[in-house]
């Protein structure tokens, strides 16, 4: 025989197992598996053991012989341990994976039949294994489905995939035809049942589909956000088994327009991070009119007032306004500073943090124009200039560049139509904006608010007596939806290449009536989503008198006219005199009648911003804003012979029976167009702070006064005076 010598024992070992009765005839039946000895390529994991089926059988051959070469010896598969059997089958599977079948071939390789003979339990059922063998197309459930005779031909058409993966995983990469019966495999059957179950319960929804919207009716004027409100009834078209997906869907729920004129707007979950990004447009003016006051930033800490006047004095006579200077006036400190005091000393003296800026005030606006001609400006600048000043050091003179921000008076107002100024703005669509940057003009603020919330009718910026902005203003929207959206946001971050600012947005209550009784002027505003209404003092006490400790609604006390605050004070606090009028007379419920009941201006008062430590609740004036109050010694009370009907048409005149009035030259609110010639300080005031009782020379006790900015000053006992509320005279005794 031409076979190798080492194959004879294996051939002999197979005879007794197959045909022991043919020993006499001399015939030897070779097991079919021993015919796979050539051209077998392993494409799965490369085994360190045999490279062919013959070598594999030779490795597992039992070497014990009886000494006679002609005695057949069993391969001994049934004598192997369970680990050896699993290892043998795994290696056999790896060696035979390269035997592929062509279309139309259904015969199995001998190695596949041998593997199925020894391990029938690796299939789900015997019938499933038989049906798999009869199919004409290969599948992942029939690993040994091709004969090894055509291995070289099948691999000649395509290159082998050299991947260090298991044999079964390599079969998954082949292109397969879908199986007609999904129950052939346990995994496929389970997947099919799960798919059918989901198909019956759910309807497919596009990924970008917006959730359904629900119409809800709520009280008039209320506004609710998804983060603060309880979860509303919401019908979803899909059911998700993942809690994370449910939470994501809840965050995406958007409530719709509600009952009344209040429109619900979608708010980001990160409400405080609402922001606007953009650039300020370049300014181009024709014969502009500048304010006499300019901002000077980047000032050295050790610069003195003399050095500033020396640098800016060449353009005209000027004065220096230090940050926090108005705090010393209101706190009773001396206005006399040490000579040659620098910026750090001024900040320390006024009790405020050290700042790097000052204000320069010129006598003539033409000096500001001359200064700007000597300044440098960036191409396309948005209103900032740069000027070099001389800072005197101990042994040398240093040249420093500071920033100059002037103000054009026409930038304080911007309206689409001039007729709005004649008709007047709508207070219920007006919001207050605070903490504005000095480079934000009315037109810039108009563009920002319109981009973020909606159409804007008019923007007004508040200025001081020098017509320089004080960092606050009012924005009137065209629609109520934009107004409520702005109120709900509360804060807007403005990001530009020049600055970053966090702008405050609050309701503006000037000339607004109570939304509960519709009779009294509104004094506060409740931002709680369950209320979101304007209230007078009485209605607030009724609606919020039983607030629990857990649910406390904090009112937004917006500075309005000081006289309105006194009306609310008289109607709310019972300890005042019974003669104090708390309501307008019959038939006089208009604004004219309301102002006719105003507190007489003979009350000694300081009309202006509150102290830095007790500023307005929402920052209606900055702590570093400077105001120099002016004392008017002449009284402004009307004569006793004047009647109520004459007061609305007369002008206030001085007489000798009143107290002084301290009027701040920096009103927070610009003059309002009133029906009666009320002095401007009444319409512009933001607080009333009265001196002590000894100021009047009267022993009358002081009483708490509920000011509009929640600052508790004092006011003497009022007495009736010809139908008016007037202060006690200087010689008044109880």
UniProtKB/Swiss-Prot annotation:
Record's compositionally biased regions (Polar residues): 259-275
UniProt keyword terms in alphabetical order: RNA-binding
Keyword RNA-binding: yes
Entries under InterPro entries matching the protein: CEBP_ZZ, CEBP_ZZ_sf, CPEB, CPEB1_RRM1, Nucleotide-bd_a/b_plait_sf, RBD_domain_sf, RRM_dom
Gene Ontology CC terms, in alphabetical order: cytoplasm; neuron projection; nucleus; synapse
Stretches the record annotates as Disordered: 1-31, 98-185, 220-283, 564-593, 630-657
Pfam families: CEBP_ZZ, RRM_7
An individual GO BP term: negative regulation of cytoplasmic translation
Regions of compositional bias (Basic and acidic residues) in chain numbering: 16-26, 243-256
GO MF annotation list: mRNA 3'-UTR binding; mRNA regulatory element binding translation repressor activity; ribosome binding; translation factor activity, RNA binding
Keyword Transmembrane helix tagged: no
Highest rank taxon of the organism: Eukaryota
Compositionally biased intervals (Low complexity): 121-140, 232-242, 576-593
Residue intervals of the RRM domain: 294-316
Gene3D superfamilies assigned: 3.30.70.330, Cytoplasmic polyadenylation element-binding protein, ZZ domain
Record function comment: Cytoplasmic polyadenylation element binding protein that binds to and regulates the translation of specific mRNAs.
Protein name: Cytoplasmic polyadenylation element-binding protein 3
Organism: Caenorhabditis japonica
Chain's gene name: cpb-3
């Amino acid at each position: 025989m031409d076979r190798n010598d080492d194959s004879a024992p294996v051939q002999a070992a197979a005879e007794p197992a197959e045909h022991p009765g043919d020993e006499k005839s001399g015939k030897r039946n070779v097991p079919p598996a021993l015919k796979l000895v050539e051209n077998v390529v392993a494409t799965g994991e490369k085994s360190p053991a045999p490279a062919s089926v013959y070598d594999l059988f030779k490795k597992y051959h039992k070497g014990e012989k009886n000494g006679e070469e002609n005695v057949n010896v069993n391969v001994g598969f049934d004598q192997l341990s369970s680990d050896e059997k699993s290892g043998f089958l795994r290696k056999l599977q790896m060696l035979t994976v390269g035997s592929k079948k062509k279309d139309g071939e259904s015969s199995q390789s001998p190695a596949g039949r041998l593997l199925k003979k020894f391990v029938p339990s690796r299939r789900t059922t015997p019938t499933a294994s038989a049906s798999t063998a009869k199919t004409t197309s290969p599948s992942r459930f029939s690993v040994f489905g091709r004969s090894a005779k055509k291995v070289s031909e099948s691999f000649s058409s395509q290159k082998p995939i050299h991947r260090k993966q298991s044999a079964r995983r390599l079969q998954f990469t082949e292109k397969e035809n879908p199986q007609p019966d999904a129950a052939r495999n346990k995994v496929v059957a389970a997947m099919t049942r799960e798919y059918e179950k989901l198909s019956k319960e759910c309807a497919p929804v596009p990924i970008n589909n917006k959730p359904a919207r629900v119409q809800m009716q709520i009280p008039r004027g209320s506004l609710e956000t998804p983060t603060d409100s309880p979860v509303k009834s919401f019908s979803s078209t899909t059911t998700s088994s993942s809690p994370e997906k449910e939470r994501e869907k809840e965050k995406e729920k958007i409530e719709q327009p509600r009952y009344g004129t209040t429109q619900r707007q979608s708010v980001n979950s990160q409400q405080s991070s609402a922001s606007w990004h953009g650039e300020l447009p370049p300014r181009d003016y024709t014969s502009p009119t500048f304010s006499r006051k300019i901002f000077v930033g980047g000032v050295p800490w050790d610069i003195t007032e003399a050095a500033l006047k020396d640098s800016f004095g060449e353009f005209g006579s000027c004065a220096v306004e230090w940050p926090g200077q108005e705090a010393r006036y209101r706190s009773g400190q001396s206005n006399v500073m040490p000579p040659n005091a620098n910026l750090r000393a001024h900040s320390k003296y006024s009790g405020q943090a050290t700042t790097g800026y000052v204000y320069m005030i010129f006598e003539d606006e033409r000096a500001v124009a001359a200064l700007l001609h000597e300044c440098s400006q960036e191409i396309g600048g948005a209103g900032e200039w740069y000027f070099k000043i001389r800072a005197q050091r101990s042994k040398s003179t240093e040249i420093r560049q500071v920033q100059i921000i002037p103000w054009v008076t026409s930038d304080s107002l911007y309206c689409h139509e001039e007729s709005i100024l004649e008709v007047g703005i709508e207070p219920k669509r007006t919001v207050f904006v605070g903490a504005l940057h000095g480079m934000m003009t009315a037109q810039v603020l108009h563009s920002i608010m319109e981009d973020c919330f909606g159409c804007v009718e008019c923007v007004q910026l508040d200025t001081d007596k020098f017509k320089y902005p004080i960092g606050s203003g009012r924005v009137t929207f065209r629609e109520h939806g934009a107004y409520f959206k702005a109120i709900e946001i509360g804060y807007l971050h403005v990001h530009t290449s020049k600055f970053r600012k966090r702008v405050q947005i609050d309701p503006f209550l000037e000339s607004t009536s109570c939304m509960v009784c519709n009779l009294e002027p509104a004094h506060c505003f409740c931002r709680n989503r369950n209320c979101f209404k304007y209230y007078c003092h009485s209605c607030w006490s009724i609606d919020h008198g039983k607030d629990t400790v857990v649910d406390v609604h904090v009112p937004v006390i917006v500075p309005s006219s000081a006289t309105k605050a006194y009306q609310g004070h008289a109607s709310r606090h019972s300890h005042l005199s019974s003669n104090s009028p708390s309501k307008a007379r019959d038939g006089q419920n208009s604004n004219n009648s309301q102002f006719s009941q105003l507190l007489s201006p003979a009350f000694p008062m300081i009309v202006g911003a509150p102290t830095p430590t007790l500023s307005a609740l929402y920052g209606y004036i900055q702590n570093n804003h400077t105001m120099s109050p002016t004392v008017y010694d002449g009284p402004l009370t009307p004569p006793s012979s004047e009647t109520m009907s004459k007061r609305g048409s007369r002008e206030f005149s001085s007489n000798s029976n009143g107290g002084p009035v301290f009027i701040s030259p920096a009103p927070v609110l610009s003059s309002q167009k009133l029906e009666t010639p009320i002095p401007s300080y009444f319409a512009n005031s933001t607080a009333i702070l009265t001196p002590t009782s000894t100021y009047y020379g009267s022993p009358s006790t002081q009483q708490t006064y509920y000011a509009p900015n929640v600052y508790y000053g004092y006011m003497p006992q009022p007495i009736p005076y010809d139908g008016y509320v007037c202060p006690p005279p200087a010689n008044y005794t109880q």
